[in-house]
Each structure stands twice: as C-alpha cells, then as structure tokens.
Design a protein with these regions (language model features):
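N-terminal Sec signal peptide and the immediately downstream disordered periplasmic leader
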Residues: 1-83, 87-92, 328, 616, ...
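Gram-negative outer-membrane beta-barrel transporters
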Residues: 27-28, 587-600, 605, 611-694, ...
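Extracytoplasmic beta-strand/coil segments of soluble accessory domains associated
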Residues: 55, 62, 70, 87-132
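Short acidic/polar hinge/loop motifs at secondary-structure boundaries
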Residues: 132-161
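Short strand-turn segments of transmembrane beta-barrel domains in outer membranes
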Residues: 176, 180-211, 221-233, 682
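Acidic/polar loop-and-plug regions of large Gram-negative outer-membrane beta-barrel proteins
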Residues: 248-250, 255-327, 354-382, 432-461, ...
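Face-selective signature of the C-terminal outer-membrane beta-barrel domain
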Residues: 324-352, 376-504, 535, 584
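Structural signature of Gram-negative outer-membrane beta-barrels, strongest in the C-terminal barrel
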Residues: 384, 403-415, 456, 462-599, ...
Length: 758
C-alpha cells in the first residue's frame, strides 16, 4: 500500500508565510516576552514560584497563580543531577515515576499512580518547545524519549502533572514534559568535555547564543559522543550526537522564531537479564550482575531479518538503539490590538531508526545450565515522520473588577507509525560480561538457533504502516479578581487512522498477503479541566482542580480486534482530582498537592503477548521543597501513592497493587559552596513494590546516590567530578511475571567534565 507522505512543501510554505507575516509587522518598538523568556524568579525562590509557566496552561502566569502542579529544572540543576539520560533526569521531579534502567531511550514514564502497563509514556506527552515529539508516547520500541537529548541547548525543563494537561495537549491526561530551548536572549556560550571511566566515555558539548542585530537573536548548540555507554559493553555502543539551532526576530507586536534540529545517535539498549525467584524474592545468577550485564558482545555482530519489502536485511546488533531525527519548525506570537493575540507553532520532523536489544526467554534452567536462550528484539522503525501545528487566538478583557482571558485554539497533527518486526533466537553463555553466542550443543557460533518465523510460536513477524491524523479544537477561559484565579477548558480530540498490517508466512518466508488487514477507523473524545487558585497572601496560595482526559492508542491495538471501523475502539481514560498549597517563608519554599487519579485502560504487552483491560485508583500526596541558608541549599520532594487495581479481566488481580508501583518515592539534592568549591548530590529513593499484578514477586526498595564536586578555576573555567550510583545499589525496576528476567538500574559510573564558559 502506498502511504501519503507528510507534506514537506506545505510545512516549508507555512514557515515562509510566517516569516513574511512577521516582517510585515517589524518596527522598532521594544520586544515582547515569549515563552523562552519567563519572568525572573527571586534569589530565594528555590522552587521558582514567581517564574512564568508556559506548559499546559492557557495563560502565562506564575506558578504561584496557576492552579496546576508544575516543577522546573534549570541547567545548573540538570548538570548537578548526575543523570546520564532523560529518564534519570525525570526522577528528580515529585509525582513522576520514571523507570530509568533502559538506557538513553525506551523509558517507562508516568505520574501519580497512573499505571505503566506496557512500555513508554502512554499518559504523559514529551514536548520540545511546546509541541509533541511524537503523537503517542507508548509506541512499542519507538517511545518519545528516544528522540530527545538533554544538552546545553536547554533553558529549562517544565513538568506538569495532571491539571490542564488533559485539555491543552493531546494524549497527555497524566502530564506534560516540556524541554524549552535557549534563544540567545542572554549572550554567551560554553564548551564542555566529559570523560568517563568504567565504562569508557568521551563527550563534547557546546553552545553559543546572542544577538545578530538589535532585534534578532540566535542560539546554536549540540553534542558529539563516543564510548561504551552506561555499562562495560566492550565496544563503542554509544556513538552520535545532535545539533539544534534557532533564530528569533522581535517585532513591534510580537516575535517570529525558526527552529532546526538534527539528531543521529546510537546508544546501547538495556533489557532485563536472567534471574531467579524464590519465595517471592529476586535472586541473581552467578556470573550475571543485573547492574552491568550486557549480552550484545563482539560475538554477535550480524543479524539477518525480513524487511518491510519482503527481502532480507543484515544489521549490526552493536548499533543498539539507533535514532535519526531531522526537524524544522517555526513559531510566532502577535498582538493584534484591542486585547487580541494570536500564537502559532508548527514543526515537521523526519524520524526513523532501529531498536535492537536482547530479551531472555528463559533463565538457563534457573541458572543451573551453562547457557540461556534469548530473543533479539530487532525492530525497524521504518517511518515515524510527523507534522504538528497549533494555533491559538486569545482575547483579554475586563469583566467588572476582574480580568478575563478567552482562548480558542486548534491542534492538527499527522503521525506516521511504520515498523517491521523479525526476532531471531540465540543461545548465550551465562556470563553477564563477555557472553559468547553458542549453538544448541554449546559450541561457539554467531548463528541463531531459530529465526523469527519460529520465535514465540511465530507470533511476531509483523509489519505495519499506519498514518494517524489528529484534529483537536479547544477552548479555555480564565478569570482573575482579587487574588482569585478561575479557569476552565474543553478539548475535542478526533483521531483518524488509515493503513495496514501484515504478518509473515513461515512456508514462503515472506509476507503473507492473506494476513493483511486494513486499518481504517475514527475515534473521538471530549476532555475537560476546571481549576481555581486563591492567593491568601503573596506567599501563600491554595488551589484545586478536577480534570478528565484520554490517551488514544496506536500500535497497541493493531493485532487485536478488527480496526476497520466495524467494532468500537477502546480508549484509555484518566480522571484526576487534586488540591494543594504553595507557600514560602524567606528562603523556604513548599509545594504540596493531594491527588486522586482513576484510570480505565486496555493494553497489549509485547513481552507477554497478552491483552489486558483494567481499572485503577490511586490516592496520594506530592511534596516539593527548597531551602537556602548561607552557603547551604537543599531541594527535595516525595510522593506517597496508595494505588490498587479496582477491576480487571483477570479477577485474581482485583484489589492488588499495580505492578512496579511503590508506596513512596523521594528525591533530595543538597549542596554546599565554600570558596571556589561546590559539593552536593542527587539522592533518589523508592520503597519496595511488586513486580507483578498478582503481588507475588517483591522488588526491594533502593536508594541511588549521585554525588558531585566542582572547582571554579576562574569565572569562566570549572571542572566537575560526578558519580552515578556511587554506592553501586542494586535497584530493580521491573521483572517478568514468571520471574525469569529482571531489569535493574546501572551500576556505579564516574565522569569528569571540564567546562569553559564565555
């Protein structure tokens, strides 16, 4: 079937038109404020409660005035976090559950007891500068975080939980994670050289921004790296980088900005490793350390798979997670007079890649054998291109003694999802480092013991090419009077899907036309959010909100019920109620939120080949604090979650805790400055959780400590030594339901960074 490409010419024409519109309005008046230039917080405002929020809200107000739970991280906090991936960085945010054990991508991310029933971030949208990275967060082997890299380009990270995320973005009823770029408003830049040992790593970061003219700013930055990755892989499993740039033209009535992004990166994929379970407790197998084990060794350098065209392709498993993304975009904001403003954003991205990682299909006879069997998840991300556009029209007016804002907007998106699966089966020696591929007799080889036509009973020789079109009109209204802020919003999401799926035939050893199924359906839903914030004083605000939203599924539906429009399409719905307080006294800041989240979902899980239908309920408390005293500062947070499965197509799980959901998670980031020396740490912990919905396997609680020490040679030059998981904690984040394989966070690593700022 021929797929319709996303119209690049239309995207470029829109960019040119936007620039021409901006040029027509260019004068010499002062520049207006845009999303990348928020109000500056006070020096003692550790939680940045006075900072203007632009993510998941209809009006640009400070955190203190918004009726949402939102956290921000600035470049210094990111640098001191010790995080080696986006997923690790998100563990610093209260309310966010980020399973950061998969490497640079393919992370499992959710919020507030909303379940992780498969992979990815089904209920949370990843954004770059206010537009989604991908339309769906839980595409198997192609999650949104795979296409995001944290580097010197980031001005700040905004993370909203619950709130109006359900109505001001698509597929985001749980929250929004927005990476906001520097735009050159502050002139300067930096070079950073990072060297890692055990495992080996070399990375160069650079950025620079400033003025091209009185009303024109720019910023450009990126990174390049090579090394083993987060574990001792024995080869350069990490190899690639990105460059991002933007230029902004300020106008008398707004601004116009153009964006560019080019990402080409290879990183290792860390999947579960063989373990055993005894009396509900996880045990390691001699020779396999879950913190360092990696089975894609030099003995496995070639894998032959069926491609989407029916031929065979040879790929190198050493490439691990390979992603390519080229994106161009534009945004503008214009004051039209008489209280009217219009905001426009669009981005066209060309995305592709390949996911390769080894998944154990057994544990070597409970560790008593000399080898185990593993399936090489070799999945081609054939086409993940997308085009997103959002336009908003705002009207500010006076109503009585108060101020009101009415917003109407339209989001339009096109997302291609095309993948090809072909998973060969290999046998490996039971060695966590330096494992050898062997044949059925145990002799060294490089060949599989079974091809994709027989793996998992031949279920998973699959290819599909589906295009999803999203249309979402939305409206929002706010009213502010005497310290009271009220807001309400509605969103109507309409999704159309068209394309096909096909499966392989073991006899003909190619795609079987008889298995081809047409995808052609339409699904829609209306979401709402209502909130209020009341400022009792300048330093104390109370807020409350109720909201409901949905996340539409993409590939998770493809091999279940018919998708030709003949049967209803299942939705994943989240309803949240929350209330809390924001308070500060001197340099002490506190942000506390009580929440209730109810989830109704259907799901397909790749590794178990099971369809599930569950309902969940979670009550809890988020707490975020910050305190400065002299040269000492500390920020921290904690999340208590009481979650349970309230209904299920498997009645044995009803009333049980959702798998991998801990009762309590916490973060602590203390720091101390003395002269030219800064010392500190990012400390992240969790209590125990269950690895399965039947609550028979316990994953112990653990704490990861990431300390750092930095020395400032002069105002421009510094060096920092940092460790990740310095105490080498063994922290499991997931386990298969039968207990044969589990995944853990990486073991201890060290890095040193020499940085020059100018």
């Amino acid at each position: 079937m021929n797929r319709k490409p996303i119209p690049t010419r239309i995207a470029l024409a829109a960019a040119i038109a936007l620039l021409q519109l901006g040029a027509a309005h260019a004068q010499t008046a002062p520049a207006t404020t845009d999303q990348s230039a928020p109000a500056q917080p006070q020096a003692n405002d550790g939680l940045k409660l006075d900072q203007v929020v632009v993510t998941g809200t209809s009006t640009k107000l400070s955190k203190m005035k918004q009726s949402v739970s939102i956290s921000t991280l600035d470049p210094e906090q990111i640098e001191h976090s010790g995080a080696t991936s986006t997923a690790e960085l998100l563990r610093l945010i209260p309310g966010v559950r980020s399973e950061s054990s998969g490497g640079e991508g393919n992370a499992n991310v959710t919020v507030r007891g909303v379940p992780i029933s498969a992979g990815g971030s089904r209920y949370v949208q990843f954004q770059e500068d206010g537009l989604p990275v991908l339309l769906f967060g839980d595409i198997a082997f192609g999650t949104a975080d795979q296409f995001v890299r944290a580097d010197y380009n980031i001005d700040r990270l905004e993370v909203i939980r619950g709130g109006s995320a359900s109505t001001l973005a698509t597929n985001s009823p749980g929250g929004i994670i927005n990476f906001i770029s520097k735009t050159g408003e502050e002139a300067g830049g930096a070079f950073g050289l990072t060297v890692g040992a055990n495992p080996r790593e070399f990375r160069l970061d650079a950025d620079y921004g400033g003025r091209l003219g009185p009303k024109t700013t720019f910023h450009v930055g990126g990174f390049q790296r090579i090394g083993e990755g987060g574990r001792p892989t024995g080869f350069n499993a990490e190899n690639g980088g990105q460059i991002r740039a933007n230029v902004t033209q300020q106008l008398d009535n707004g601004y116009v900005r153009l964006y560019l992004k080019a990402l080409d990166d290879r990183t290792p994929t860390f999947l579960p490793v063989p373990v055993t379970v005894s009396n509900g407790q996880i045990n390691t197998i001699p020779g396999i350390d879950p913190r360092t084990a990696f089975f894609i060794t030099p003995s496995l350098a070639r894998d032959v798979t069926l491609n989407k065209d029916g031929g065979f392709t040879t790929s190198n498993p050493h490439d691990g997670l390979r992603v390519k993304s080229t994106a161009v975009g534009a945004e503008g904001s214009f004051k039209l007079g008489d209280g009217w403003t219009v905001d426009e954003k669009f981005r066209k991205s060309v995305n592709s890649g390949r996911f390769m990682g080894l998944f154990p299909s057994d544990n070597g006879a409970n560790g008593t054998a000399t080898s185990f069997t593993g399936v090489l998840f070799n999945t081609s991300l054939d086409n993940f291109d997308n085009l997103f556009n959002e336009i908003k029209l705002n009207k500010a007016l006076t109503l009585g003694d108060g101020k009101a804002t009415v917003t109407g907007g339209l989001f339009n998106g096109v997302q291609n999802v095309a993948e090809t699966w072909f998973w060969n089966t290999y046998k490996f020696t039971l060695n966590g480092i330096g494992a050898q591929v062997v044949n059925a007799a145990g002799a060294p080889t490089s060949a599989p013991i079974g091809d994709g036509f027989t793996t998992f009973g031949g279920c998973c020789v699959r290819s599909w090419d589906v295009q999803y079109t999203q249309l979402a009109p939305f409206v929002a209204a706010t009213y502010e009077i005497a310290g009271l802020n009220l807001d309400a919003s509605l969103r109507r999401d309409i999704q159309k899907a068209s394309g096909y799926t096909v499966s392989g035939n073991a006899t003909t050893r190619t795609w079987d036309p008889a298995t081809q199924k047409i995808v052609n359906y339409k699904v829609s839903h209306t979401s709402y959010s209502i909130g209020a914030n009341y400022a009792l004083t300048r330093d104390l605000s109370l807020f409350a909100r109720t909201s409901e939203g949905v996340s539409f599924s993409a590939d998770r539906l493809l091999y279940g019920n018919p998708l030709d429009g003949s049967v209803p399409i299942s939705l994943n719905k989240v309803t949240q109620t929350e209330g809390g307080a924001k308070w500060r006294s001197g340099s002490l800041n506190v942000f506390a939120t009580l929440f209730n989240a109810r989830t109704d979902e259907s799901n397909f899980e790749v590794t178990t080949q099971k369809f599930t239908s569950n309902k969940y309920s979670a009550n809890g408390l988020e707490l975020e604090t910050s305190w400065y005293v002299g040269s000492f500062h500390v920020a921290g947070g904690g999340t208590y979650t009481n979650a349970k499965i309230t209904a299920s197509n498997d009645p044995t799980t009803e009333g049980k805790k959702p798998r991998r959901q801990a009762d309590f998670t916490w973060q602590l980031t203390p720091g101390y400055s003395i002269g030219n020396v800064d010392i500190g740490a990012a400390i992240i912990g969790t209590t125990k959780s269950f690895g399965d919905d039947q609550n028979t396997i316990t994953m112990p609680g653990f704490t990861v400590v990431n300390p750092y020490v930095s020395y400032q040679f002069n105002p421009k030059t510094s060096i920092m030594l940092a460790a990740n998981n310095v105490f080498n904690a063994l922290g499991y984040t997931e386990i298969e339901g039968d207990g044969h394989a589990a995944r853990a966070v990486n073991g201890r690593t060290w890095r040193a960074t020499l940085k020059y700022q100018f």
